[in-house]
Regions:
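Catalytic machinery of carbohydrate-active enzymes
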Residues: 1-241
Length: 241
């Protein structure tokens, strides 16, 4: 068994999808650690891989305790992230993940694969009773993460007027992939830098806007520096509302 542990935000799982698919092989047996709140999304992401198993762990200490308990002779592990070295040049978080394993960052896009459930997506889409054009917005008006500096609410003045706005609704689903059809059919997609932005980037859509917040701790992970081949994000910088 090879145990895989990585940074555990949902956006990190999108960043590392192509990396993990590059590192594993069909003859191995793998177990990926995942937070309970992201389990449904990550299980669907890798549901095409019969040799991928999952263990729920919410902190790195839980991962360490679990490995100490179950690790056997002959087992191995893949660590993605943690103990970031000084590369001598500026690198984003996702570049660090790939450089750490000597994998080309282009594999983030070239090797990305996520299984979609079109029936689930359609059922979810129909909940919004859409009869007109709309834009899709993901921001965060209630961010209470201790490492963040308050909510990142997209200023409505930066959004098109006279069009329906559909925002991500907390707790309406535990599976981010349910939103795929809703995102694909939007006239525009506006996101803060987040798991929705990373997923949308990898879906290779058009009409995309990334709202970057200079005070955000994730500012060095900016999407639009690396996606010139695929999704054409337009950058909008705005301080917290």
């Amino acid at each position: 068994m090879t145990y895989i542990y990585q940074h555990m935000g949902l956006g990190d799982f999108f960043m590392c999808n192509g990396l993990i698919r590059t590192l594993i092989n069909e003859n191995g047996e793998y177990t990926l650690f995942v937070k309970n709140i992201y389990e449904d999304s990550v299980r669907q992401m890798y549901s095409d891989l019969p040799n991928m198993n999952f263990i729920v762990a919410n902190t790195i200490s839980e991962i360490a305790d679990t490995l100490h308990r179950i690790f056997k002779p002959g087992d191995s592990h893949i660590c993605i992230g943690y103990n970031r070295p000084n590369f001598g040049i500026p690198v984003t978080t996702e570049e660090w993940f790939y450089f750490q394993h000597n994998i080309d960052i282009e594999n983030k896009w070239n090797k990305f694969k996520a299984v979609r459930n079109k029936d689930r997506e359609l059922d979810f889409f129909n909940k919004f009773n859409i009869k007109e054009d709309y834009i899709f917005v993901h921001d965060d008006d209630e961010d209470t993460h201790p490492e963040h500096r308050g909510p990142k609410k997209i200023d409505d003045s930066l959004l098109p007027s006279n069009i329906r706005i559909i925002r991500v609704t907390p707790n309406i689903t535990n599976n981010i992939f349910d939103y795929c059809l809703l995102i694909e059919n939007a006239k525009e997609v506006h996101c803060i830098e987040s798991c929705f932005a990373y997923m949308t980037d990898l879906l290779n859509l058009n009409g995309l806007y990334i709202h970057e917040y200079p005070e955000s701790p994730s500012k060095n992970d900016g999407l639009n520096d690396r996606n010139d081949k695929l999704a054409d994000w337009k950058n909008l910088i705005k301080k917290y509302k």
